[in-house]
Structures are given as structure tokens and as C-alpha cells.
């Protein structure tokens, strides 16, 4: 098994606490409204805290797929949220799991900076595919921007 680590950062005009609430606390309701590809989010196991497993159903390339999302840590006081993709038909065969450690911090003019560390655990001696990595980054950036756009269009959401 190989472990490959990547870091990324995104900026947003949305305040950190409001963005965190949409991305974490109200994610099951907000994300399917904001992100066109995600059809639904349902809790498969758990109460929303660490250990909870959620099923995200999405449409990618015209196909309906799903991934299993396991919550690893929730730290509302420090605006941190860690989770892993642990299964589903949306996970490449060469990957055991993908872990995300996320944190929101104050950005310019009352906005946010989203920081993420991504750890990809591969099966056997498989290497992450560079094209898959670029595509995953593009999906992550589009996801973050979709949430920002939704919140900008819905100023009543607090």
C-alpha cells in the first residue's frame, strides 16, 4: 500500500462560520441543492459524529454512482472537518481510501480560506494516476465554488 499526500487551498467570499455550517452541519440538505452532480446524501450508519457513514449519490459522465463518506473528526470550534471516502462505485479500483483533513480560516474582507490535506491510500503498489488527481482537484474546486455560489444567492441562509 502506498500513501500519497497532497495539499490545496481555496478562497471564498463567504465567512468561515457560515461556510462551515453549510459544508458540515447542514451538508445533507445544502449540498444536493448547490452541487448539480450530487443527487442525495443519506446517513447509512451513525449519528452525524465521528464514525458516521454517509452515502453520496451522484451523476458523473451520465452514470449514477455513489461513494461512502466516513466522518473521521468534527471540530466546530476550530472549523475543522475530517472525512474519508471508503468505498462505492465512484472510488477507483486501485484506491483503498481517500482521506481529507479540512479547515476553514479567516480570509480577506471577511471571507474564508479553505485548506485541505488529501491522503490517498492505494492498494498494493499502485500509484495515483496523475489525470485522476487533476480531475479530482477540478471536482473539489468546482464543489467549493458551487457551495459559495449557493450561499451568495441565498443571503437568508445563516
From Swiss-Prot:
Out of the domains of life, which is the source?
Eukaryota
Q: Where are the annotated coiled coils located?
A: none
User: Which Gene Ontology terms of cellular component type are present?
Assistant: cytosol; nucleus
Q: What are the protein's UniProt keywords? A: Allergen, Calcium, Cytoplasm, Hydrolase, Metal-binding, Nuclease, Pathogenesis-related protein, Plant defense
SUPFAM superfamilies from the xrefs? Answer: Bet v1-like (SSF55961)
Q: Broadest EC class?
A: hydrolase
Q: Which GO terms describe its molecular function?
A: abscisic acid binding; calcium ion binding; cytokinin binding; melatonin binding; protein phosphatase inhibitor activity; RNA nuclease activity; signaling receptor activity
Residue numbers binding trans-zeatin 1: 8, 83
Record's InterPro entries? Bet_v_I/MLP, Bet_v_I_allergen, Plant_def-hormone_signal, START-like_dom_sf
Per UniProt, where does trans-zeatin 2 bind?
60
The positions annotated for binding Ca(2+) are: 32, 35, 38
Cell compartments where the protein resides: Cytoplasm, Cytosol
* EC number per UniProt: 3.1.27.-
Single Gene Ontology BP annotation: abscisic acid-activated signaling pathway
Entry binding sites for trans-zeatin 3: 69, 81
Name the job this protein performs. Answer: Class II ribonuclease (RNase). Binds to cytokinins. Interacts with melatonin.
**Database matches in PANTHER family:** OS08G0374000 PROTEIN-RELATED, STRESS-INDUCED PROTEIN SAM22
**Similarity comment text for this entry:** Belongs to the BetVI family.
Q: Under which name does UniProt file this protein? A: Class 10 plant pathogenesis-related protein 2A
In which organism is this protein found? Lupinus luteus
The record's gene field reads: PR10.2A
Amino acid at each position: 500500500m502506498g500513501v500519497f499526500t497532497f495539499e490545496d487551498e481555496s478562497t471564498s467570499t463567504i465567512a468561515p462560520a457560515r461556510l462551515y455550517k453549510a459544508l458540515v452541519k447542514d451538508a445533507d440538505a445544502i449540498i444536493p441543492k448547490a452541487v448539480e452532480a450530487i443527487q442525495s446524501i443519506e446517513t447509512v450508519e451513525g449519528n452525524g459524529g465521528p464514525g458516521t457513514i454517509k452515502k453520496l449519490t451522484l451523476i458523473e459522465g451520465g452514470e449514477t454512482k455513489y461513494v461512502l463518506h466516513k466522518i473521521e473528526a468534527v471540530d466546530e470550534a476550530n472549523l475543522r472537518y475530517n472525512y474519508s471516502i471508503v468505498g462505492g462505485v465512484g472510488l477507483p479500483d486501485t484506491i483503498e481510501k481517500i482521506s481529507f483533513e479540512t479547515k476553514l480560516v479567516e480570509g480577506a474582507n471577511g471571507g474564508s480560506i479553505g485548506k485541505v490535506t488529501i491522503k490517498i491510500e492505494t492498494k498494493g503498489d499502485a500509484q495515483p494516476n496523475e489525470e485522476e488527481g487533476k480531475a479530482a482537484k477540478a471536482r473539489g474546486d468546482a464543489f467549493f465554488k458551487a457551495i459559495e455560489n449557493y450561499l451568495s444567492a441565498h443571503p437568508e441562509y445563516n
